[in-house]
Amino acid sequence: MDKTRRRTLVALAFAALGGARLAHAQQPGVNYTVLKPEQPVNAPGKIEVLEFFWYGCIHCYNLEPVLEPWLKGLAPDIQFRRVPAIFNPRWAHDAKTFFSLEAMGVGEKLHRPLFDAIHQDRLRTDDAQAFNAWLQRQGVDVKRFEEVIKSFGVQSKVRQAQQLTVGYRIDGTPAMAVHGRYTVSVDQGGSQRGLLKIVDHLVALTRKSLPAAR
């Protein structure tokens, strides 16, 4: 056997061993939670991944620089969606803000800038004067925003987000859920990168059981 082939076989063997160790290391109840009952998903033919977050959560803010490149590398069979977790009226207000910006078509564009404004500039979304001034600086029509935030569509999405928070038994943020079957927190992942590695593992588990998602 020539040296090149031998090295290739050794590398493949180590890769297989590493993958087996990784799968073995991810233990249900320790590194992630198995949901019982499973929650309904809204991603026909795809694997649904949800991120539960709150704009005021420093851990969610710290996840963003790691999450952004991860999202760019998502496989086409994965559908990712952000869900503002809701535990109290303050969180519900930020959920309304999130869904209003989304409805106006600027949600993705302003997601990171809003995080920055909150955690770097101490902006509060419940300070109407300060927040409206921030919206104006971003080129958002404040009058239109004030109409949208009171709309039936936004109120419905807030109720749905609250139901998802309860249904997925989310007790802190950030947390991620995979296809209605699993949830994982930063504590379970050990770090932001660890969280995403476990999500990758759970996506792989789900993919094996969903032929249509391959």
Residues of each region from the PLM?
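Conserved strand-to-helix beginnings and helix N-cap segments that scaffold or border functional pockets
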Residues: Y61-E64, W91-A95, G189-Q192
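Extracytoplasmic/secreted envelope proteins and their assembly/folding machinery
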Residues: E64-L71, D94-F98, H111, A128, ...
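A general structural motif at alpha-helix termini
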Residues: L12-A13, L114, I149
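Residues at secondary-structure transition points
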Residues: P44-I47, A92, D126, G190
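Solvent-exposed loop/turn segments at secondary-structure junctions
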Residues: Y55-H59, I86-R90, D116-D121, S151-V154, ...
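Structural microenvironment flanking redox-active thiols in thiol-disulfide oxidoreductases
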Residues: G73-M104, E108-Q136
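Extracytoplasmic thiol/disulfide redox context detector
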Residues: D2-P89, Q162, A204-R214
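C-terminal cap of thioredoxin/glutaredoxin-like
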Residues: R137-R214
